[in-house]
């Protein structure tokens, strides 16, 4: 009989000549990949362990399985190279039977995450961790066994097709891939059949009458099919009977009923562990996502662990699965995109949670839309349909991609990543973008694959503004976005970027080096930011009330604004036990509360309550703002001379002035240069240039400078210059 031996212990890790014992999962970038500076180690390290030859009967095979080695792996056994794998997120296997010696064997895995031009990803806003960060298993199988393919493909493939929704009739095709067997016995839901093996495959078809459907969060029911060989070898596989449809006007449809996909994206790493996470950590992530009420996850930007896909199957989350073909097309990387897509599909085919295969993410951010790029996407699209005719393809497009681009015609459904109201522009430009797209292409399905605003929960403000990294502005941002999305059910899927803060070692902003802080939950999973509860109010069926601002204790304003999120229809607010006001409404409740000292503020809704403590302060708490924004309260040296230009004037009008325009252009050009590829793409895109010009019509010079990340002293200095330039009368 076959057996699986876990090989996670007994490894020696070697980096630059230094040895240390490690247990898998392991990454060498758990610290330096999260601390900023963009200087984390990218190179080749090795993992070595002794491997005792297992007891093998005649015809038995020994197969090593690696579930995740980042980014390139070379496997050597007793000095002989037995395998090489390019891609850091998928499973690969190697048959080592003929390379094994009696007794002890030396297994060395060389792992490389260095910069190159052939293996994706190479350019993106997240850390490319190196290491063996998922399980390693030795499979010992008899001569007749279920196939353990090198590309990690499932040995039993299940294709359910709901042929009659009204009757809940589901036709289930089961294919078993075997070696050395003549037939396979299949069992499903009390039905049994036997099928002969032809060219390594046995195939059977079952019909389930009145099937129990896999119905998302409401009832994620899973069937189990069992395949058995005559020698007793058995393989069990879970699957779900469900029907996915995507309609340009109705959005996502599950089993015949509208089911708008509203949820989050997830990166797999976490503080202190990097990508070397445990199943318990995955379960914690899932519990947080479910608490918020999300019904979909975009598993970005690569293949995630099988254990997490299993959780999604069990809990009823609908999944967008994708490969790390991201940001920048590489001429020498075409083959790698196809390999990673093949592995993604053949390894995850049976998961009922997966609805779409993602071809790429923001691939035009640093690449031109040329024939080579288009051909690569066509090849990926064709491969996905060949390997899986049952699921549509999609891609996440960067905001500056024109909606008339030919690349949008390749996948079955599309989606856009937009950051209006954070990186650029105003919040209502998100509304305008999708309304324009939907009006121009009413027969195309469109989704919202990324949107978000960074928030450091230490930063708070009574006057939140774009670019201040406050938890308060993140709430303002998401309040607009949540309502905008709720008003547009034809958006087939929307995914907040991101559920959790994650490592991006090149970042140095918002008071935390090395982190992207757009998460609704902190990197260590310890703090649910206030915006988490906004989406809970929109999505969750579990009644609750949440008072925002628990970390905004010291307040200088005489009358403070208190925001409350709840999915209940009525909220009452109390100060020190006395009723302030009762409001009816939905999701967001705003109260104005006079404060004079230390107060307890409590929101009550039904049987639920939430309390925060506030303190009337005479001076702003400097810990509530970034150091370059602590003097923002007064940008001016004195009263403004209205006959001269100032940072309070309209940006478009100022740019049009012969004297002021060149001064501002020099500043905006400098800011654009600092943003590199993205800014260059905007400059070369007429549609985005026009969009920016429209944004300037509504922005002040001050607003544009803050958006560009200018510090307080620079803005004050510019205001002094502008106050010396008279306006033409």
What are the residue ranges of the model-derived segments?
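Secreted/periplasmic carbohydrate-active enzymes, especially glycoside hydrolases
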Residues: 1-301, 316-319, 340-343, 350-356, ...
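Long, contiguous interaction/targeting segments characteristic
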Residues: 63, 69-143, 463-537, 667, ...
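Intrinsically disordered, low-complexity coil segments
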Residues: 142-168, 230, 509-512, 526, ...
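Substrate-binding/catalytic cleft of secreted carbohydrate-active enzymes
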Residues: 173, 286-289, 296-527, 531-538, ...
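In a subset of proteins, long, contiguous C-terminal domains/tails are tracked
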Residues: 532, 537-540, 575-576, 600-636, ...
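Compact, charge-rich alpha-helical regulatory domains located at protein termini
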Residues: 635-728
């Amino acid at each position: 009989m076959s057996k699986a031996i876990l090989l996670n212990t007994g490894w020696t890790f070697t980096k630059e000549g230094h040895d240390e014992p490690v247990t898998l999962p392991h990454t060498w970038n758990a610290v330096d990949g999260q601390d900023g500076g963009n200087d984390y180690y990218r190179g080749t390290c090795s993992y070595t362990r002794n491997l005792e030859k297992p007891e093998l009967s005649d015809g038995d095979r020994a197969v090593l399985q690696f579930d995740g080695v980042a980014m390139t792996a070379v496997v050597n056994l007793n000095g002989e190279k037995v395998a090489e794998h390019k891609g850091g997120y998928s499973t690969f296997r190697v048959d080592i039977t003929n390379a094994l010696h009696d007794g002890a064997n030396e297994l060395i895995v060389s792992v490389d995450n260095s910069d190159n031009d052939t293996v994706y990803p190479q350019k993106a806003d997240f850390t490319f961790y190196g290491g063996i960060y998922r399980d390693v298993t030795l499979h010992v199988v008899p001569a007749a066994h279920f196939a353990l393919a090198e590309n990690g493909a499932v040995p039993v493939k299940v294709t359910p097709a709901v042929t009659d929704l009204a009757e809940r009739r589901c036709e289930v095709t089961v294919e078993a891939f075997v070696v050395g067997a003549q037939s396979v016995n299949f069992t499903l839901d009390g039905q049994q059949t036997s099928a002969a093996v032809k060219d390594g495959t046995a195939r059977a078809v079952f019909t389930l009458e009145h099937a129990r459907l896999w119905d998302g969060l409401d009832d994620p029911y899973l069937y189990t099919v069992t395949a058995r060989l005559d020698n007793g070898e058995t393989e069990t596989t879970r699957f779900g009977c469900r029907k996915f449809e995507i309609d340009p006007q109705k959005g996502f449809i599950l089993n015949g009923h509208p089911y708008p996909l509203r949820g989050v994206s997830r990166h797999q790493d976490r503080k202190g562990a990097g990508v070397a996470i445990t199943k318990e950590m995955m379960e914690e992530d899932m519990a947080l996502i479910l608490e918020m009420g999300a019904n979909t996850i975009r598993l970005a930007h690569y293949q995630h662990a099988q254990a997490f896909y299993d959780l999604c199957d069990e809990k009823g989350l609908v999944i967008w699965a994708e490969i790390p073909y991201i940001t920048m097309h590489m001429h020498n990387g075409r083959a790698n995109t196809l390999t990673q897509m093949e592995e993604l599909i053949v390894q995850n085919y049976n998961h009922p949670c997966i609805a779409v295969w993602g071809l790429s993410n923001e691939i035009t951010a640093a690449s031109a839309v040329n024939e080579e790029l288009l051909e690569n996407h066509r090849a990926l699209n064709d491969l996905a349909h060949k390997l899986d005719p049952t699921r549509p393809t999609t891609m996440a497009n960067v905001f500056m991609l024109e909606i008339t681009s030919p690349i949008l015609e390749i996948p079955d459904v599309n989606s856009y990543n937009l950051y209006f109201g954070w990186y650029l522009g105003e919040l209502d430009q998100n509304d305008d973008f999708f309304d324009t797209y939907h009006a121009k292409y009413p027969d195309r399905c469109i989704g919202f694959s990324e949107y978000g605003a960074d928030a450091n929960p230490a930063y708070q403000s009574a006057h939140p503004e774009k670019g201040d990294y406050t938890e308060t502005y993140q709430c303002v941002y998401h309040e607009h976005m949540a309502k905008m999305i709720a008003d547009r059910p034809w958006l087939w899927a929307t995914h907040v970027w991101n559920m959790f803060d994650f490592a991006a070692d090149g970042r140095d902003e918002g008071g935390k080096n090395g982190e992207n802080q757009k998460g609704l939950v902190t990197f260590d999973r310890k703090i649910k930011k206030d915006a988490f509860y906004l989406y809970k109010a929109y999505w969750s069926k579990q009644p609750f009330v949440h008072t925002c601002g628990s970390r905004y204790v010291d307040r200088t304003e005489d009358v403070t604004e208190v925001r409350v999120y709840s999915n209940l229809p009525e909220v009452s607010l109390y100060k020190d036990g006395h009723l302030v006001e009762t409001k009816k409404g939905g999701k967001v409740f705003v109260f104005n509360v006079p404060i004079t000292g230390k107060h307890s503020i409590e929101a009550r809704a039904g049987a639920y309550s939430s309390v925060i403590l506030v303190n009337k302060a005479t001076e702003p708490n400097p810990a509530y703002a970034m150091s370059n924004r602590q003097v923002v309260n007064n940008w001016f040296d004195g009263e403004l001379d209205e006959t001269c230009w100032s940072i309070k004037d309209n940006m478009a009008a100022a740019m049009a002035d012969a004297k002021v325009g060149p001064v501002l252009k020099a500043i905006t050009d400098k800011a654009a240069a600092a943003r590199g590829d993205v800014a260059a793409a905007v400059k070369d895109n007429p549609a985005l240039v026009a969009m920016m010009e429209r944004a300037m019509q509504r922005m002040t010079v001050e607003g544009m400078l803050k958006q560009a990340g200018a510090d307080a002293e620079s803005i004050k200095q510019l205001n002094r210059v502008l106050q010396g330039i008279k306006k033409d009368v």
